[in-house]
Amino acid sequence: VMAEIACRALSPAVNDPGTAIDVIGRGVRILSTYAQNKSDEIEVKYPSVHVAPLQNNDLLEDFFSPVARDGAGMREIQIRVLKGLSMLSKGWPGIFSEAAHNLAFETLEHAIRADHIDSDRCLIKSIYYNLFSGEDSNKKP
């Protein structure tokens, strides 16, 4: 739902990147709270009811992918997405690192393909490399 709010704010009819940036920040805080409280030891209260466990990759993809895609033409959105992914990756590497790296690269690809002026494209690339290069040498550049 939060990604939908951010995407709606980025639509041409609304064109409100400030709301999308606010939603990205809130999403990062929610995912951080989830990571802080995540436990492998779960008390089963209702053994007859089965609920599939949350997948960390899905949590990040469901939130960040649509926002990065719909905000591809706005440098402030791309930068905020990269910073949010970096915070989650560095704050909880065992939970979010792999998905955050993959989504950061996807965000960079969206930015490169978007119609940015050269200085914006260089800024986004620079931020990506500053935040994500060196963390995991097996990831795409």
Question: Can you say where each PLM-predicted feature lies in the sequence?
Answer:
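Short basic (Lys/Arg) and small-residue
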Residues: 1-141
